[in-house]
Amino acid sequence: MTKEEALNKFAQLGAVWFGNSKQHFAFSAYCRLQGWNKLADKWKEEAEEEWEEAEEVLNRLVELGCKPADLQELMKTQEFPFCDDPKLQIEGDYQPEAIKELSELAEAFCDDYPTKKLIEKWIEGEKDHMAWECQYLNYIDKLGYENFLTAMM
């Protein structure tokens, strides 16, 4: 991956983080409206973390000479579907391949320590995120969907 390709991928990830954050805030509000307060709290926590990470991306991109307008343009091309079904939302958000992509991106920034460390921090956050999603999917399988939703109240 060339430096320019890595920078473009980094900018795309920033757009994804902002979009995911907005999607997760919306899903959190929906869960709260349905009475699934524990689930709402978890998605809100995730949304806040992703928003902070997106801000870190934006700040780093500006430091690297990118313009915020470029990130905004990238956000227009991203789709962030909203599910009103918690299981579908979790399944749609659960993307283990993201760890590999982030690891490859971190390696592309081997000569840019601040960016590499930032990406490595996200890798750990994504591992945690996927761990709770996997845990929730296992709860759904073991408890049954209705019992899971009741437990999330």
Place the predicted regions along the sequence by residue:
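Iron-associated oxidoreductase/ferritin-like identity signal
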Residues: M1-M153
